[in-house]
């Protein structure tokens, strides 16, 4: 059976290391980390990766007041990806766009903030915001993109821990091949630095990294003095199209997705299973028609 080839025609991102692919890549190659110390509720000063972008570039004051940080990151990344793709977006059928955004977790930030806020009023829930539920539903980051852009095609947020962004890309590829959409926005976002629970959780596991003098040296996984990770926020969204559609409009083709695979370790909550990892990679290479050896 013929399957359409799926290509990437646009990339948009925001990260502690930059707000464009060019800036992000240059900082990576130059060894720039841009980790800083932030003062986090109940935790004190902790190292974190903080994005530096202007959400007002694409959002109104009302959207920012009602929405979430994850939503702002998702909207910024999606809008930048659309611009990068060269699509005539405003004149396209928005019902033929799909939005598939992966996230590790969502809703913790908003719930923590509300509990803290009502603690000032003896935990009187009359002071609990009516925006809480729409902010914390799992599909929020993808949903905020559709509200901002006017996209009326399918959208949902995919939870797959640290692989959620990849899962979003795979879902987009499958929907394009099924003909459910003509263009897909897919990727991943995280607002984790806004949640003290994330930091406290990693600290309780002995996995929250520190460095005695330089926060930029905190993340050092291949160093014998390594002692944990750095929690960061950020997002990246790709524009995906069928190859024939991209070629027909003369699009700049950045890359092609030639293979993928998802599996499960089925062994532990956090410890990776090397056998399952190797199995997944070999299966992806097989789908791509590539020799693992």
Give residue spans per PLM region:
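Condensing-enzyme catalytic core mediating Claisen C-C bond formation in acyl metabolism
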Residues: 5-9, 29-37, 213-292
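Short glycine-aspartate micro-motif
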Residues: 6-8, 96-100, 182-186, 219, ...
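Conserved beta-ketoacyl condensing-enzyme motif
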Residues: 7-8, 25, 29-157, 189-199, ...
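Acidic, glycine-rich active-site loops and adjacent beta-strand->loop/helix elements
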Residues: 13-14, 103-106, 160-164, 188-193, ...
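Conserved active-site and cofactor/substrate-binding residues in soluble primary-metabolism enzymes
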Residues: 19, 23, 65, 69-76, ...
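Active-site-proximal alpha-helical scaffold in enzymes
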Residues: 74-87, 138-149, 155-189, 229-251
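Glycine-/small-residue-rich "gating" segment that lines the acyl/pantetheine channel
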Residues: 120-129, 170, 174, 178, ...
């Amino acid at each position: 059976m013929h399957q359409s080839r799926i290509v990437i025609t646009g990339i948009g991102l925001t990260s502690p290391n930059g707000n464009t692919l060019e800036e992000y890549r240059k900082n990576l190659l130059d060894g720039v980390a841009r980790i800083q110390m932030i003062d986090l509720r109940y935790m004190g000063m902790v190292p974190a990766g903080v994005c530096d972008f202007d959400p007002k570039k694409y959002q109104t004051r009302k959207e920012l007041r009602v929405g979430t940080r994850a939503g702002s990151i998702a909207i910024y990344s999606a809008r930048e990806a659309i611009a990068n793709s060269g699509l005539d977006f405003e004149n396209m059928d928005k019902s033929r766009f799909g939005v598939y955004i992966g996230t590790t977790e969502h809703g913790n930030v908003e719930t923590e903030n509300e509990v803290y806020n009502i603690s000032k009023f003896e935990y009187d829930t009359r002071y609990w915001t009516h925006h809480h539920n729409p902010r914390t539903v799992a599909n929020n980051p993808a949903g905020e993109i559709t509200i901002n852009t006017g996209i009326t095609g399918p959208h949902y947020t995919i939870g797959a821990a640290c692989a959620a962004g990849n899962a979003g890309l795979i879902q987009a590829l499958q929907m394009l091949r099924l003909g459910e959409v003509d263009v897909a926005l897919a990727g991943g976002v995280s607002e984790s630095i806004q949640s003290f629970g994330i930091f406290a959780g990693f600290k309780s596991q002995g996995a929250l990294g520190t460095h005695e003098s330089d926060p930029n040296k905190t993340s050092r996984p291949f160093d014998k003095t390594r002692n944990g990770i750095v929690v960061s926020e950020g997002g990246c969204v790709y524009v995906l199209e069928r190859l024939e559609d991209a070629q027909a409009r003369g699009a700049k083709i950045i890359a092609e997705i030639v293979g993928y695979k998802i599996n499960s370790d089925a062994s532990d909550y956090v410890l990776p299973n090397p056998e399952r990892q190797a199995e997944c990679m070999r299966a992806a290479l097989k789908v791509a028609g590539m020799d693992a050896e």
